[in-house]
Design a protein with these regions (language model features):
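A short beta-strand-turn-helix
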Residues: 33-53
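Short, small/polar residue-rich loop motifs at catalytic or cofactor-binding pockets
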Residues: 29, 53, 132-134
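N-proximal helix/coil linker or "cap" segments that precede and/or mark the start of modular domains
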Residues: 5-6, 10-34
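Short active-site neighborhood of thiol/selenol oxidoreductases, capturing the structured segment around
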Residues: 47-68, 74
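Thiol-/selenol-based redox modules, centered on thioredoxin-like
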Residues: 133-170
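Structural microenvironment flanking redox-active thiols in thiol-disulfide oxidoreductases
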Residues: 68-106, 118-120
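Short, internal strand/loop/helix patches
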Residues: 35, 89, 102-135
Length: 170
């Protein structure tokens, strides 16, 4: 009986594309991966994160309640993040068109990466379930990971990041 249940569980996870890659950890380099943003422009994530601060946050689906709160949290704290020189990329498995509509609807001031093939998720070790990225956030300084939020908050995303950065200056 246990064998049958185990076999069924593995089969279901395989069919629905659940994956659990090894995640980026504090001290890791920014993964070398390129992905199109909401305009179709290719973004070299490692190049963008080589100097200064880069926040890369993953969310399951554009224009859904939790993901909207997360993006708007960062938008609403954009001035504070900007003073600290934080660049931001939001990443989901949505299409470029969906990312563009999400960005425009909520006036998000940062790029949204359309990771349709899940290459960015794989490079960062972010798991996907049923094709959706797990909510996770990474902060890099000069090409190295300095902070990971494995469950990444929604409405408090910006305040959590800002609190971490403030703790680093004390």
């Amino acid at each position: 009986m246990r064998f049958t249940l185990s076999l069924m569980t593995c089969s279901l996870l395989s069919c629905f594309g659940a994956s659990s890659p090894e995640p980026v950890q504090v001290g890791s380099a920014v993964p070398a991966v390129t992905c199109n943003d909401q305009t179709g422009q290719a973004v070299d994530v490692a190049k963008e994160g080589a100097k200064g601060l880069l926040l890369v946050y993953f969310y399951p689906k554009a224009d859904t309640p939790g993901c909207t709160k997360q993006g708007c949290s960062l938008r609403d704290s954009w001035a504070e993040l900007g003073k600290l020189g934080v660049k931001v990329f939001g990443v989901s498995t949505d299409s470029e068109a969906d990312q563009k509509a999400f960005k425009e609807k909520y006036k998000l001031p940062f790029a949204l990466l359309a990771d349709k093939n899940k290459e960015v998720c794989k490079a960062f070790g972010v798991s996907t379930t049923l094709g959706y990225a797990s909510r996770t956030a990474f902060l890099f300084r000069d090409g190295k990971c300095i902070w990971v939020d494995p469950k990444s908050s929604t409405s408090d995303q910006a305040s959590v990041v800002l609190s971490f950065l403030e703790s680093q200056t004390k």
